[in-house]
Regions:
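N-terminal auxiliary segments of SAM/dcSAM-dependent transferases
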Residues: 2-91
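Short, solvent-exposed loop/helix junctions and linker helices
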Residues: 15, 19, 62-68, 105-109, ...
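Short helix-terminating capping/connector loops at secondary-structure junctions
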Residues: 34-37, 125-128, 249-252
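Phosphate/oxyanion-binding loops and surfaces in catalytic or ligand/nucleic-acid-binding neighborhoods
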Residues: 47, 51, 77-81, 121, ...
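SAM-dependent Rossmann-like transferase core, predominantly class I methyltransferases
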Residues: 58, 63, 73-169, 182, ...
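S-adenosylmethionine
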Residues: 148, 152-153, 157-299
């Protein structure tokens, strides 16, 4: 539930000192799992005050009534299972502070690893570089690539108009020039000028896995960005590989894909079996799981 227009309710802290307010907030987060509670409390306190714990201690901070009201509303939303990123209205990704909403996936650390890998590929290319980010969502990957390689031309493709608005807003806030296109990844037209790099974090979770996932994800993040049919889990990978092979990706260009950890080997095998691809590699994430597939389009 959004916090717009919502007011906090008691009980309230016995005083407005930082120590008392911190203890009050911790106790108020009663439905948040114990190991997460202290971290979420810290994020809320820093977000509302604009200061870290040390800064608040040095300043001997006293919390205002309006700030306590915001903390109470935010704590209630967390207790109701809303993601912390939605409660704060923002998420950090590869050094960028990004707006997030229920219209987009919350950026994950694993996706930062794909951006880093593809940024390394961009660094090894000569001449003008064009990068496409399919299923861009919040624009996190496109904007992170633009931050790392300001001279690259970056294009973000997205089917959801609501998500595109979030991406555009993030680009404006970051002061970055990224071109955003409304398009369907499964029926994509060829670009006028081919790309040097294509990357994507497409939907890849089989629909049958919904019941095994945390409600914090399934109830608050867009299903269209998460799930694929059980009988065709590689549908987006096939579409993007075909789009690239038809000319959207230059020969010698790179394709980078985030995958379900149970499907990365299958995606890699599909590219190897299809032909026209070289250097097909599976990259493991920081948890040691097969998360990304990177491949190079073969030269003629």
């Amino acid at each position: 539930m959004s916090g717009v227009g919502r007011r906090g309710t008691g009980p309230w802290p016995s005083s407005n000192t930082d120590a008392v307010v911190t203890a009050w907030l911790m106790s108020r987060l009663s439905d948040v799992e114990g190991e997460e509670r202290s971290g979420m409390a810290r994020w809320l306190l820093e977000h509302v005050s604009g200061q870290g714990k040390g800064e608040r201690m040095v300043a001997d901070m006293r919390w205002h009534e309006s700030q306590l009201d915001r903390l109470a509303v935010m704590a209630d939303r967390l207790n109701e299972g809303e993601p912390i990123q939605h409660v704060l209205g923002e998420s950090w990704f590869d050094g960028l502070r990004l707006e997030v909403s229920p219209s987009v996936l919350i950026p994950r650390p694993e996706t930062e690893e794909l951006v880093a890998a593809m940024a390394d590929k961009v660094a090894g290319l000569e001449g003008a570089v064009r990068v496409a980010d399919w299923c861009t969502g919040s624009g996190c990957m496109a904007l992170a690539m633009k931050r790392r390689h300001p001279h690259a031309e970056v294009v973000g493709y997205e089917w959801s108009m609501d998500a595109l608005e979030v991406a555009r807003s993030n680009a404006r806030s970051a002061g970055m020039d990224v071109h955003w296109i409304h398009a369907d990844a499964l029926h994509a037209e060829q670009p006028e000028t081919p790309f040097s790099v294509v990357m994507s974090n497409p939907p890849y979770i089989p629909a049958s896995e919904r019941t095994t996932m945390h409600a914090r994800v399934t109830a608050h993040e867009p299903s269209m960005a998460l799930f694929v049919p059980d009988d065709d889990p590689l549908v987006f990978y096939r579409a993007m590989a075909s789009w690239c092979a038809q000319g959207a990706l230059v020969p010698g260009g790179w394709l980078g894909l985030e995958c379900h950890t149970d499907k990365a080997h299958e995606v890699a095998g599909f590219l190897e079996g299809k032909g026209g691809w070289k250097h097909v590699d599976i990259l493991h994430d920081l948890q040691g799981l097969p998360r990304h597939v990177v491949a190079r389009r073969a030269l003629p």
